[in-house]
Swiss-Prot record:
Catalyzes the phosphorylation of D-fructose 6-phosphate, the first committing step of glycolysis. Uses inorganic phosphate (PPi) as phosphoryl donor instead of ATP like common ATP-dependent phosphofructokinases (ATP-PFKs), which renders the reaction reversible, and can thus function both in glycolysis and gluconeogenesis. Consistently, PPi-PFK can replace the enzymes of both the forward (ATP-PFK) and reverse (fructose-bisphosphatase (FBPase)) reactions. This is Pyrophosphate--fructose 6-phosphate 1-phosphotransferase 2. Pathway: Carbohydrate degradation; glycolysis; D-glyceraldehyde 3-phosphate and glycerone phosphate from D-glucose: step 3/4. The keyword Magnesium applies. It catalyses: beta-D-fructose 6-phosphate + diphosphate = beta-D-fructose 1,6-bisphosphate + phosphate + H(+). The gene is pfk2. Its EC number is 2.7.1.90. Substrate binds at T140, I141, D142, M186, G187, R188, E247, Y308, E309, L310, R311. Homotetramer.
């Protein structure tokens, strides 16, 4: 029977999120107390995919007490991350297995979103269950993983808090030097982050993909929703404001709209096949179109992206505690014989949930948790926005006032914009 210390390998995959170092520290410190050896794989699966043991060793670090003892306060990740995807081929998966075996990794902890977890499970499926156990800690500032009891993903609270501060400053700026800011917020498929930042800061409008009734969104509809809101505020003497746009709007756009955003070419994708939403320049495209329509009214519009500056912020207290618990939960799950599982927190308890239980049978991928547009939370956020509602269009005096601000007749205004109440959920 081997007396060698079990080896725990840790890697981060996907984009950074506040709290990554907290998970690394939480897991490492507990494992070291158990007498395990802990190593960190630099840049996710990038070097493991090469299958070259010497290359992997050169990009692997021993995680010791001195290295991790105080890193839970820090943003970023000390072992770096990447979007390398071993699921691209069976050869890449076998390369990863080869390297894990060579380094005698018994426990494999991945920290990332659904792509990272899927990659880890696919690797483990080609190995004996007694040879390696795989656990993942779910991470994304998008908050779109289907965790139980509406538990947020780690990093979301920190990202929302910092995003709120940025938008709050833009709110003051927009009034001080009158203009509209169109703020594009990260969120690949869901609008949790955009809506959270907008509601917390009191932004005048927020548009998320979940509120559109049709399966596909048209660029023209998004333009007109913002345009009508700008005119409504202008009717009240306010030639300034802030509109927050979830970049996930792009994911739901029609092929016609996508070609417009990407300059009549196929949208580029990342190694996991996701559209590179940042390349769509949604806020800039909307700003350019709105200036054509509203420039004669003296409206100034400035596009702004909020995303990368949120990903490596130092975690707020909630995420610092949360991630430490997830790190502990991962090691506890290994000790209790779990594998192919995600570590989640439910009702104050950290526990493993089988990865397969979170999969969408239709796609084979982890289900996306969308914003519940029927919830009270969404209704509260909506009621404080300046968008034109069905009730507004029934108010003839208001319609006349807003139409006049746009130098239009009430009839022309209604014909152009009233249909939008059927485009989005009221």
């Amino acid at each position: 029977m081997s007396t060698e210390a079990p080896v725990l390998g840790i890697l981060c995959g996907g984009g950074p999120a506040p709290g990554l170092n907290g998970v690394i520290a939480g897991a490492t410190l507990y494992a070291l107390r158990l007498g395990w050896k802990v190593i960190g794989f630099m840049e996710g699966f990038k070097y493991l995919c090469t299958g070259d043991i010497e290359t992997v060793k050169a990009h692997t670090i021993d995680l010791t007490y001195d290295i991790v003892s105080r890193i839970h306060f820090q943003g970023g990740t000390i072992i770096q991350t990447s979007r390398a995807n071993p699921r691209k081929s069976t050869e890449l998966q076998e390369n990863v297995r080869k390297c894990l075996r060579a380094l005698k990794v018994r426990y494999f902890l991945t920290i990332g979103g659904d792509d990272t977890a899927s990659s880890a499970v696919s690797v483990a499926q080609g190995m004996d269950g007694n040879e390696i156990s795989v656990i993942s800690c779910p991470k994304t500032i998008d908050n779109d993983l289907p965790l139980p009891a509406d538990q947020s993903t780690f990093g979301f609270h920190t990202a929302r808090s910092l995003g709120m501060e940025i938008i709050r400053n833009l709110m003051v700026d927009s009034k001080s030097a009158p203009r509209w800011f169109l703020v594009e917020a990260m969120g690949r498929s869901a609008g949790h982050l955009a809506l959270g930042m907008a509601e917390a800061s009191g932004a005048h409008l927020c548009l998320i993909p979940e509120e559109f009734k049709q399966d596909e969104i048209e660029f023209e509809d998004v333009v007109e929703l913002v345009e009508a809101t700008i005119l409504k505020r202008l009717a009240y003497g306010k030639n300034y404001g802030v509109c927050v746009l979830a970049e996930g709007l792009v994911s739901k756009m029609s092929k016609k709209a996508l070609y417009r955003l990407f300059g009549n070419r196929e949208p580029p994708t990342d190694p996991h096949g996701h559209i590179l939403l940042d390349d769509a320049e949604l806020a800039r495209s909307l700003s350019e179109e709105l200036l054509k329509r509203l420039g004669n009214l003296g409206i100034r519009i400035t596009p702004k992206k909020i995303g990368y500056e949120l990903r490596c912020a130092d975690p707020v207290a909630f995420d610092a505690v949360y991630t430490r618990e997830l790190g502990y939960g991962a090691i506890d799950a290994f000790l209790n014989g779990h594998s192919a599982a995600l570590i989640v927190r439910e009702n104050g308890q950290v526990k493993p949930v089988q990865f397969k239980d979170l999969l969408d049978p239709a796609t084979g991928r982890v289900r996306t948790r969308l914003v519940d547009v029927t919830s009270q939370s969404f209704k509260v956020a909506r009621v404080y926005m300046w968008r034109m509602s069905k009730k507004d269009y029934e108010n003839k005096d208001l319609v006349a006032r807003v139409a006049a601000a746009g130098k239009m007749t009430p009839e022309a205004f209604t014909e152009k914009f009233a249909h939008l109440t059927d485009v989005v959920i009221e």
